[in-house]
Amino acid sequence: MLGMFLPSLAIAQEIKVPTGFQVSEIAKELGATRHLTVSKQGHVYAKLSKLKDGNGIVQLKDANQDGVFEGQKWFGNYPGTGIMIDQNFFYAASNKGVFRYALDANGEIADINKPETIVDGLPDHGRDNAKPFVFDRDKKHIYVTIGSWNDPCRVPGTGQGMNPCVILDSAGGVWQFDANKLNQRFQDGLRYATGLKNAVGITWNQQTNSLFAMAHGRGQFHDFYPQYYTPQQSQELPAEAMYEFKKAGDDAGWPYIYYDHKQNKKIVAPEFGGDGKKTGGEKALDPVVAFPAHMGPNDILFYSGNQFPAKYKHGAFIAFHGQSAELKKGYLVAFVPFKNGKPSGKWEIFADNFAGTDLAKPTGPIQHRPCGLAEGPDGSLYVSDDLGGSIYRIQYKK
């Protein structure tokens, strides 16, 4: 389906960014736009988690490269989150699989009605069922998140955890598949990374040649274990954490442990004998970076462009889809500087006020929730919003 609208270069002054940066709203009211990708021609593609007029993918085209995206093209009759484009194919995910579309000589999708299946039949239990994906550096493998539908891997109706947590056999991690083989099924994959309740934000760091993932933390400590956790602790724990997976089998520890960013320790989950103080997970990974609880990291991008100032080169941008009771902040894009593949400074807020209201003293409903990130060929940063359906372009104006 083709669509046209009457756009203009709308400067989004309500979005707060560092001095020298400018934010423009290149589209709005698109629907539940999740992850993004940008072609080398500068066309922006977004995946929708809910169909809009029967379509789950939208292409935004700036035909004359003037910064105004005057054309829309809708296709793909399946909802989902993951999306990516390279020189040969356009890729998109449903909640059960990943598909690819061949590109023509102009970098356009040759036939929007003829996707090929890379993998299908992945577990989908209706909750935390997004299938974000990423390729490794040499494009030999594709890595797909399969989130857990059970927040703490607790036996229903009890306060006890499943021990062992059988969910980890088919969820709670990232699975590796052959990137160049068609019609694969779940059983063809390798569980590459485990111990991740739900990693909506995953990426391949080209500098370290390794997989990075942003883990959504569990919740409801006080609801089920008031003897160990106060309501405030329940609001402020556990950390939302960034992990680096260097090899198959690396384990972030869920559901047996969680990371407490206040104690700077891996703590045994109460379902498995913990009391909020007992440490564990000696064999589990330590986080690369720990963020406040319940911020909902939904995408991560390592910046490779040259448009932004030097401090941003190879650093990590993270789109946060929720808010922190601890900070009274949320719905923002954060930045972590990196040097030689390691964080070189504290995380900071890069783009803020997507919410459109002061979260410490809200006066109205939330307006926008950052969800996806993408880098354009000119080094611009794109941010999707799956609440208001806007897409933003952040540029550095020298």
Residue spans of the language-model regions?
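Beta-rich catalytic cores
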Residues: 29-32, 53, 71, 78-79, ...
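A short helix->beta-strand "capping" segment at the edge of beta-propeller domains
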Residues: 13-31, 345-349
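Residue-level detector of Asp-centered blade-edge/turn motifs that repeat once per structural unit
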Residues: 38-41, 85-87, 135-139, 203-208, ...
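Asp-box/WD-like beta-propeller blade repeats and closely related beta-sheet repeat scaffolds
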Residues: 71, 80, 96-137, 193
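Beta-propeller domain segments
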Residues: 16-17, 130, 148-187, 196-198, ...
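Blade-level signature of beta-propeller repeat domains, shared across WD40, Kelch, NHL, RCC1
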Residues: 374-398
